[in-house]
């Protein structure tokens, strides 16, 4: 309802603002399970045209209030999200989970009371370290979309293995690999796994803070869960629950092999970012973009590992 | 454009003016990138030599500057004939030129990583044996500070422990009698633009054959990324030994020998 009114207002205001960039977030939650909605982010890089709204978000209705998993990139997004979610459930937001440190998931918490925002201790530490830099980067890319957004840290450290909201219980899993602290959640009532950025689906995984062996271990744990479906951090809903897990693993395995082969056969970084991407990833959004980012993340380390030392003592 | 036509008209109407030298007109072609620094850099790098933008030379780089301290670039001028010099520069960097390379006995190809201090044109310029310069490049969007933030090795504090470490390998390239050399250095490549850290950078590097023949030589500047990595294609056969010598602004020398492998490793990854 609120969206319709907002859209109408935006339409009425158009003549007055003609020529100005439209910086209103259009948030469309889609029901995916009983009492759970997914907001599908743009499966693209962070860009002014999408306002940085690229991460998926979950809205969960419980007997005692509304829960959110992730909060979007900005104060404006967080405020719109809060209004949309509360309009949907008719209950106030009482908990916001932040799955990991990255700003497309966590800068929107600026719209909420820090006391209701929960994240893994590691993620909070990492946000305190990198948040300022992320904030600068988003302001540079997104301009007015970010207006008023301040860096806020979650006020609650997740140390418990589950949290109960009037009978709706969420299992909270402290994992790692996409970052040093990745939260995954399992809704016990529906069997829905909310994977955060441990899961990418039809959208290439991003690796700026990745530890690939730990990521594989985490994917192993997720694959063994008794879940029925999965809501990935980026990309469409996965009704099978296993496809996003398998696809994420397939990509990071291929990525490591391809970059290792590139270093060992003498390619430079530009060439490594231009290697063919296998046909099975053809449906993956932002594949070339993420490959080239990953080259930047991993290449120096792989060179140090695979190129032999050749220096002679200083004479 | 309109201004150019106006000038032409003026010249046509005043025959006397044609005899006057230097009508305050830039001797360089109009910059397709519309960079504010084009003429200044052109004067510095090209001087009185002829210049043109030419699609036959390629400056290759990724679609996103993921790390403004280390932006990969490759300048490829294979197929345009003999090349004397290859220059990689970024117009709006405080240290614009990154590398000035002379491929004496090498294919005209060089790849490295550079710092970007802001959104800037990044260019490659190639001088043919005739003296003609060919230029290519594009605007690259980047977060600021690549040249004015301290290098990672200064932050972690371990740069001195690894200074002078070199890694490298060389592989034969097909049938052309050329080999691909990759060489990396551990070096902070301090720009002098960070408070209380003076300029400290590798400033020259040569690659010679085992008999001492100069294959390629270059001047490097502090806008080359920390821990420089360089890819060249010297004309040597499998089994040859490449001798690499570099020197930094403190006079420290760096020397390495890299044998060219007997076999190409291209089975591992497709060569572009």
PLM features: what roles do these ranges have?
Chain A
Residues 1-23:
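N-terminal export signals
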Residues 22-31, 125-174, 179, 188-189, ...:
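Metallo-beta-lactamase
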Residues 31-84, 184-196:
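Conserved beta-strand hairpin/beta-sheet module of binuclear metal-dependent hydrolase folds
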Residues 69-71, 95-102, 118-120, 194-196, ...:
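Active-site neighborhood of phospho(di)ester-bond hydrolases with catalytic His/Asp-centered motifs
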Residues 78-79, 83-161:
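Active-site HxH/HxHxD metal-binding segment of metal-dependent hydrolases
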Residues 169-225:
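Active-site-proximal loop/helix segments of hydrolase catalytic cores
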Residues 214-271, 275:
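Divalent-metal (often Zn2+) His-rich catalytic cores of metallo-beta-lactamase-fold enzymes
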Residues 265-315:
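C-terminal regulatory/interaction regions
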């Amino acid at each position: 309802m609120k969206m319709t009114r907002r859209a109408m207002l935006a339409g009425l205001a158009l003549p007055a603002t003609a020529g100005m960039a439209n910086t209103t977030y259009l948030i469309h939650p889609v029901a995916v399970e009983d009492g759970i909605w997914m907001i599908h982010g743009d499966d693209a890089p962070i860009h002014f045209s999408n306002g940085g709204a690229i991460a998926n978000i979950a809205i969960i209705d419980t007997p005692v209030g509304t829960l959110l998993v992730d909060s979007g990139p900005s104060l404006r997004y967080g405020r719109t999200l809060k209004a949309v979610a509360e309009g949907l459930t008719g209950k106030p937001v009482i908990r916001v989970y932040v799955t990991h440190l990255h700003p497309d998931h966590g800068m929107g918490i600026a719209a909420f009371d820090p006391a209701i925002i929960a994240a893994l201790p590691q993620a909070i530490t990492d946000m305190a370290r990198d948040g300022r830099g992320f904030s600068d980067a988003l302001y540079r890319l997104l301009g007015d979309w970010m207006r008023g957004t301040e860096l806020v840290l979650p006020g609650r450290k997740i140390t418990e293995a589950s949290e109960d909201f009037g009978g709706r219980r969420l299992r909270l899993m402290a994992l790692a690999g996409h970052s040093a602290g990745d939260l995954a959640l399992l809704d016990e009532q529906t069997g829905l796994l909310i994977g955060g950025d441990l899961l990418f689906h039809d959208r290439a995984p991003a690796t700026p803070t990745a530890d690939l062996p730990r990521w594989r271990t985490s994917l192993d744990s997720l694959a063994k869960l008794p879940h029925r479906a999965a809501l990935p951090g980026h990309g469409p809903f996965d009704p099978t629950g296993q496809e996003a897990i398998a696809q994420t693993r397939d990509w990071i395995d291929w990525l490591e092999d391809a970059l290792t082969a590139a270093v060992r056969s003498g390619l430079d970084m530009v060439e490594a970012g231009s290697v063919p991407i296998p046909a099975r990833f053809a449906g993956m959004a932002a594949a070339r973009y993420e490959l080239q980012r990953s080259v930047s993340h991993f290449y120096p380390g792989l060179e140090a590992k695979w190129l032999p030392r050749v220096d002679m003592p200083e004479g | 454009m309109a201004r150019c036509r106006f000038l032409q008209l003026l010249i046509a109407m005043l025959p006397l003016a044609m005899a006057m030298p230097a009508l305050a007109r830039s001797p360089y072609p109009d910059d397709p990138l519309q960079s504010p620094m084009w003429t200044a850099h052109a004067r510095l790098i090209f001087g009185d030599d002829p210049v043109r933008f030419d699609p036959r030379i390629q400056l290759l780089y990724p679609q996103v500057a993921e790390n403004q301290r280390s932006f990969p670039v490759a300048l490829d001028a294979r197929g345009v004939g003999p090349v004397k010099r290859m220059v990689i520069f970024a117009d709006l960097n405080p240290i614009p030129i990154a590398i000035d390379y002379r491929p004496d006995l090498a294919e005209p190809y060089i790849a490295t990583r550079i710092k970007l201090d802001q959104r800037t044109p990044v260019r490659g310029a190639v001088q043919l044996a005739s003296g003609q310069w060919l230029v290519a490049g594009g605007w690259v969007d980047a977060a600021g500070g690549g040249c004015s933030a301290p290098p990672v090795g200064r932050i972690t504090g371990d740069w001195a422990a690894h200074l002078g470490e070199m890694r490298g390998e060389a592989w034969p390239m097909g049938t052309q009698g050329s080999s691909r050399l990759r060489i990396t250095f551990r070096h902070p490549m301090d720009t002098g633009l960070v408070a209380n850290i003076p300029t400290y950078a590798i400033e020259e590097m040569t690659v010679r054959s085992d008999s001492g023949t100069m294959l390629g030589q270059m001047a490097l500047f502090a806008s080359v990324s920390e821990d420089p990595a360089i890819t060249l294609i010297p004309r040597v056969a499998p089994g040859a030994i490449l001798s690499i010598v570099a020197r930094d602004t403190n006079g420290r020398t760096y020397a390495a020998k890299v044998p060219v492998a007997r076999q190409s490793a291209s089975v591992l990854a497709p060569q572009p």
